[in-house]
């Protein structure tokens, strides 16, 4: 929730806090349910979203059932993927493979700053 709020503030001028992020844990998915999903070619991943709406910015972190061959599902373990859906460049993304604490927060912010500087 904290990372979602920070990114929304930086990229979308959301002026929000982690408390405003809708949250749902992944704990409701039992091992049996995960096996059923795998047999059907699906997986469950914890996905963070920031979406602009007519009423402002909607922020959420919740489990989503994804196709195993999809881009979001391809990220394994503690790795993370950031996708930005832009007006002019379409969808751009960055992935961090097995990041540590420093890489997760600072690295992501630094990379985004570089991207914004490049496209400005």
Positions of the model-derived regions?
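Substrate-binding/catalytic subdomain of NAD(P)-dependent oxidoreductase enzymes
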Residues: 1-74, 79-81
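Catalytic, metal-anchored helix/loop core of enzyme active sites in primary metabolism
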Residues: 49-51, 57-120
């Amino acid at each position: 929730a904290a990372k979602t709020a920070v990114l929304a503030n930086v990229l979308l001028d959301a002026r929000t806090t982690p408390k405003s992020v809708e949250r749902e844990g992944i704990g409701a998915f039992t091992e049996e349910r995960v096996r059923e999903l795998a047999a059907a070619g699906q997986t469950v991943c914890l996905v963070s979203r920031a979406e602009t709406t007519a009423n402002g910015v909607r922020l959420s972190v919740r489990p989503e059932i994804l196709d195993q061959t999809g881009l979001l599902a391809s990220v394994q373990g503690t790795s993370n993927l950031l996708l930005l859906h832009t007006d002019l460049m379409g969808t751009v993304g960055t992935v961090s493979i097995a990041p540590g604490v420093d890489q997760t927060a600072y690295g992501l912010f630094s990379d985004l700053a570089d991207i914004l500087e490049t496209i400005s």
